[in-house]
């Protein structure tokens, strides 16, 4: 369920939904206040100088707005936007075709930039630093290199795994920002904004309930809103009420902390199969039947943020919060945490 709620949309209808609700200006972007305030200054200064904006790196968990910010940057700069991802750029030739198609002031957005191959990454260095690339013509003894000048452009890179970026690539980004999880209050505002755009009536309490269970992530909040709309429509109601919101969340097995079935499997595996840890990520992944990359990128950041698991040099461990919520005991206790007569 979490992958479904977090994945970047590929279905045409889902893409249309994302485009419909996506803000096009920084002033309409909710959250990440310091980041957007700084970007506003950097963009204005670059436009006044008539220069390309320095290359921008966004890092952080999925669903927080990295792609949306790339769209906004292109819009604010008045340039075009080309979108690709690290896994798609498997050969330097693929990157060269993209780079040579860019016009002055355009933005190139590379999602999952940490997944670039070393050959493609090295090819990107001269493009980022000097706006040029070297094309190899022919092969063997007759091979020769031709240098092509590129129009000044801005590269926006996005990653959920900043630690996997090489130092040379990271150093070439003049602007680097990490996106943080959103507060429930901000998510509530986003839900109400999306509902207004889509023509959905929703109670304030219902919006708050969905916001609190959205894992601090706008993409999840918006998709849960869509599911609540479905339940409301089938119930032949004109308004998403608190009762219908809770019914939706219960059907999706999302609890009051925003945890879904896989989150619970991860925590219970830590507690029951590994005695609370520490345990390596590969062993934990095998125990729950999930890829370790997915656990690291999708599930683990929120579980750490909310204090249910912790990372140590020896592996992942369950926290007191996990013991309390799932077992009703604290580490080392012999009995239930809440017994009769306890104060």
Swiss-Prot record:
Residues 1-182 are annotated as: Large ATPase domain (RuvB-L). DNA binds at residues 311, 316. Its main location: cytoplasm. It is found in: Cytoplasm. Pfam families: AAA_lid_4, RuvB_C, RuvB_N. ATP binds at residues 21-22, 63, 66-68, 129-131, 172, 182, 219. Residues 256-343 are annotated as: Head domain (RuvB-H). Residues 183-253 are annotated as: Small ATPAse domain (RuvB-S). The keyword DNA damage applies. Coiled coil: none annotated. Its EC number is 3.6.4.-. Keywords: ATP-binding, Cytoplasm, DNA damage, DNA recombination, DNA repair, DNA-binding, Hydrolase, Nucleotide-binding. The keyword Glycoprotein does not apply. GO terms for biological process: DNA recombination; DNA repair. Mg(2+) binds at residue 67. GO terms for cellular component: cytoplasm; Holliday junction resolvase complex. One of its GO terms (molecular function) is four-way junction DNA binding. Has 3 domains, the large (RuvB-L) and small ATPase (RuvB-S) domains and the C-terminal head (RuvB-H) domain. The head domain binds DNA, while the ATPase domains jointly bind ATP, ADP or are empty depending on the state of the subunit in the translocation cycle. During a single DNA translocation step the structure of each domain remains the same, but their relative positions change. The RuvA-RuvB-RuvC complex processes Holliday junction (HJ) DNA during genetic recombination and DNA repair, while the RuvA-RuvB complex plays an important role in the rescue of blocked DNA replication forks via replication fork reversal (RFR). RuvA specifically binds to HJ cruciform DNA, conferring on it an open structure. The RuvB hexamer acts as an ATP-dependent pump, pulling dsDNA into and through the RuvAB complex. RuvB forms 2 homohexamers on either side of HJ DNA bound by 1 or 2 RuvA tetramers; 4 subunits per hexamer contact DNA at a time. Homohexamer. Forms an RuvA(8)-RuvB(12)-Holliday junction (HJ) complex. HJ DNA is sandwiched between 2 RuvA tetramers; dsDNA enters through RuvA and exits via RuvB. An RuvB hexamer assembles on each DNA strand where it exits the tetramer. Each RuvB hexamer is contacted by two RuvA subunits (via domain III) on 2 adjacent RuvB subunits; this complex drives branch migration. In the full resolvosome a probable DNA-RuvA(4)-RuvB(12)-RuvC(2) complex forms which resolves the HJ. Belongs to the RuvB family. This is Holliday junction branch migration complex subunit RuvB.
């Amino acid at each position: 369920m979490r992958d479904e709620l977090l994945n970047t949309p590929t279905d045409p209808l889902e893409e249309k939904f994302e485009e419909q609700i996506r803000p096009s200006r920084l002033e309409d972007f909710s959250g990440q206040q310091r980041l957007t305030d700084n970007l506003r200054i950097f963009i204005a200064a670059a436009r006044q100088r008539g220069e390309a904006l320095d290359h921008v790196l966004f890092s952080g968990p999925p669903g927080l707005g990295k792609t949306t910010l790339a769209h906004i940057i292109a819009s604010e700069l008045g340039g075009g936007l080309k979108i690709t991802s690290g896994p798609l750029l498997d050969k330097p030739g693929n990157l060269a075709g993209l780079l040579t198609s860019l016009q002055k002031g355009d933005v190139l957005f590379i999602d999952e930039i940490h997944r670039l191959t070393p050959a493609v990454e090295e090819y990107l260095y001269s493009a980022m630093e000097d706006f040029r690339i070297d094309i190899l013509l022919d092969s063997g003894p007759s091979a020769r290199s031709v240098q092509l000048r590129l129009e000044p452009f801005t590269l926006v890179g996005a990653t959920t795994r900043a630690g996997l970026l090489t130092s040379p690539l990271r150093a070439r980004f003049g602007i680097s920002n990490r996106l943080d999880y959103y507060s429930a209050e901000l998510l509530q505002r986003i839900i109400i904004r999306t509902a207004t755009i889509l023509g959905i009536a929703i109670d304030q309490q219902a919006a708050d309930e969905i916001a609190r269970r959205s894992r601090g992530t706008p993409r999840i909040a918006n998709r849960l809103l869509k599911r609540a709309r479905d339940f409301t429509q089938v119930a032949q109601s004109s308004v998403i009420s608190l009762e219908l919101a809770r019914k939706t969340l219960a059907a999706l097995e999302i609890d009051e902390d925003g945890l879904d079935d896989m989150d619970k499997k991860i925590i219970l595996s830590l507690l029951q199969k590994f005695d609370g840890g520490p345990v390596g990520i590969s062993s934990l992944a095998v125990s729950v039947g999930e890829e370790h990359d997915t656990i690291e990128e999708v599930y683990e950041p929120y579980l750490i943020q909310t204090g249910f698991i912790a990372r140590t040099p020896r592996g992942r461990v369950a926290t007191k919060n996990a013991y309390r919520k799932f077992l009703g005991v604290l580490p080392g206790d012999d009995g239930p945490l809440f017994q009769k007569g306890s104060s």
